Each structure stands twice: as structure tokens, then as C-alpha cells.
Amino acid sequence: METRESVYAGVIADKDIVLVAGTNSPESAMAAFAVGAKRRVQDCALGKAVLAFQPPRVIDEVERSFSAAATEGSDPEALRAELELIRSRGYAIHLDEKRGTECEIAVPVIFAGETVEAAIGISGPSSRLTPDAIPALAEHILATAEKISRQLS
């Protein structure tokens, strides 16, 4: 399956996800973030896909940073519920709440069969990454992440 969407890979660094690789969709007019760019883990699908599989102490640290920063959209209870959903279905979704036009889907990459420090994912307009399309796209990304995980084991 070819998605023709932007593809990214990121690694966790403290409370951020750092983009380490990516390619932009030939069909997207949206601005992409560049390799080396950082986003808070709770603000993107790549970050949530990694955070969901971190030890409780790491999640607690992210929640404490909510209180310190008092940032918009930083609800610890909602985050915990979302992380539980990510663990159960295997992938994260992030909708751009500010613009409402972009959707991201990401899955964790498992290192040596046990730790999650990275994720891969796609992003594109919500007109193409619709609720009906997301499960099939997520399955494709999950299969790709499993191949990467096997190569890293």
C-alpha cells in the first residue's frame, strides 16, 4: 500500500520527540517540520506513540510538566486515557485541533523486543486521513514498524 502522505520517524528525548527522518508528500501543500525539529511528546502522534509505551515515571514527568507550563490542551487525565487507547489498538492519532486540517497516525518501533524509543508515522490532510481510512493506514504503518523492529532485534 502506498499512502502518498508525508512520512516521519522520531525518537524520544526527555519530554520531546525529535524528528530524525522524513519525506514530504508530493501531494501536500502543508508545511512539514524539518529533521531535528522538536515537539512536545503529547502534541503529536509520533510522541504519543512513544509515550504510551514508556514506564509510568516518564508519563508522570510529562504530566508534571503540564502543571509547570499550564499549556492549552494539557489535561493529564485525558492524556492517560488516550495513552491507554494507544496501547490497546497499537497506534496513535493526532488531529490538529487548531487548524482542524491535518491528521497524523503513528506507531511505536520496538527495540530488541522490549523498549520503545522511536516511532514512525504519516501525516496528511484530514480530508484524506478520514476516520474510515485511518484503520487501514494504521495497519500498513504497524506492519512497517514490525519489520523495522525485527531488523533492530
Please state what every model-predicted region is.
Residues 4, 55, 88-92, 146, ...:
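Generic structural signal for secondary-structure transition and capping sites
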Residues 6-8, 38, 92-93, 104:
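Histidine-centered metal-chelating micro-motifs
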Residues 21-28, 116:
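Acidic-glycine-rich active-site phosphate/pyrophosphate-binding loop
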Residues 1-24, 136, 140-152:
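Intrinsically disordered, low-complexity terminal regulatory regions
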Residues 72-145:
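Extended hydrophobic
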Residues 14, 24-25, 46, 127:
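Residue-level signature for short turns and capping positions that connect secondary-structure elements
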Residues 28-98:
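Short, solvent-exposed recognition segments
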